[in-house]
Design a protein with these regions (language model features):
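Glycine-rich, N-terminal phosphate-binding loop of Rossmann-like dinucleotide-binding domains
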Residues: 50-53, 91, 136
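Rossmann-like NAD(P)(H) cofactor-binding subdomain of soluble oxidoreductases
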Residues: 55-121
């Protein structure tokens, strides 16, 4: 079972693809986009996508507080469970953040999985991606590679450390911004 917290254009794209292969539980503040709640997702799903906004602060830095709040909630609940949860971060976060979170949230295996979507074509972009980057530690990245291989059999899946994956996201965004 797969959980997805956040059903904006990224979370919805993940849902549209994964629902064809797994039972998928979704949660969003907009109840019309949810088929579950956060607690049910945490208890039932060993693999949880976090697709939440990380808006820019006034100083230009990335505001990761929404994601951290959700990770804290997941960590508090999973601390009492027998199995750890693989948390797949889709939100844009500064390099080094996933590594910091893996030290802070000991009951979670946090992996950064950058998205390269356009808002107008998010579902199509996600369904037709040719590369998937999983940034984190083993065994989480190995388990997730198996899951992603089933859903994206033709995509090239790259396992790396989380900081490199976060840098790839930032560098790609920078490159795309120069093309505007």
């Amino acid at each position: 079972m797969i959980g997805i917290i956040g059903q904006g254009f990224v979370g919805n794209a993940v849902y549209q693809k994964f629902k064809n292969y797994y039972d998928v539980f979704t949660y969003d503040l907009d109840e019309s986009k949810s088929n579950s709640n956060v607690n049910e997702i945490i208890y039932k799903c060993e693999n949880i996508f976090v697709c939440l906004p990380t808006p820019m602060n006034e100083d230009g830095s990335c505001n990761i507080s929404i994601v951290e709040t959700v990770l804290t909630e997941i960590d508090l609940i999973t601390d009492n469970l027998e199995t750890q949860r693989n948390i797949i971060i889709k939100s844009t976060i500064p390099p080094g953040t996933t590594a910091k979170w893996n030290h802070r949230f000991e009951s979670l295996n946090i992996v950064f999985n950058p998205e390269f979507l356009t808002e107008a074509n998010a579902v199509s972009d996600y369904e037709n991606q040719d590369r998937i980057i999983l940034g984190g530690v083993r065994p989480a990245t190995t388990e997730l590679k198996t899951i992603f291989s089933k859903v994206f059999p033709k995509a090239h899946i790259i396992k790396t450390d989380s900081t490199h994956a976060e840098m790839v996201k930032y560098l790609t965004n920078t490159f795309l911004a120069t093309k505007v």
